[in-house]
């Protein structure tokens, strides 16, 4: 079973352009998601203690996929952004929670993945920051 860590605290540093999501849960190795726009890409750094995964998906693709997400009962993630080797699997829950699974695939024998959950308030901040326009709006 997957263990999703909630990211319910967010900080937008307008000086550096860094958007940070973290957990309010007091734990020694709290997960953290840092994002920064870099031209046509978004640099993501996902860390959990000393382990970090860095991805650079195209911002237009991320914006488009987030705008088309709908909750599908029984499925955790329904879309992916990136390539077959490095991607973010995304899923929207019926309560507005966004599931994110940044993944690095080694080959057919394994992968490294972070299971993150953005609360509805955190998701709203992300959507505004990326510039998401929902298809149903």
In which residue ranges do the predicted regions lie?
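Positively charged, low-complexity terminal tracts
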Residues: 1-137
């Amino acid at each position: 079973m997957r263990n999703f860590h909630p990211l319910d605290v967010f900080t937008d540093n307008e000086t550096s352009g860094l958007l940070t999501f973290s957990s309010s849960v007091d734990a020694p190795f709290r997960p953290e998601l840092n994002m920064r726009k870099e031209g046509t890409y978004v640099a993501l750094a996902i860390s959990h203690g000393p382990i970090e995964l860095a991805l650079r998906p195209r911002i237009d693709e991320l914006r488009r996929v987030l705008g088309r997400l709908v909750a599908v009962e029984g499925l955790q993630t329904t879309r992916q952004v990136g390539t077959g080797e490095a991607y973010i699997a995304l899923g929207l829950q019926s309560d507005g929670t966004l599931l994110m699974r940044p993944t690095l695939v080694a080959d057919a024998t394994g992968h490294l993945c972070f299971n993150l959950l953005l609360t509805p308030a955190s998701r709203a901040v992300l959507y505004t920051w990326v510039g998401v326009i929902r298809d149903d709006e």
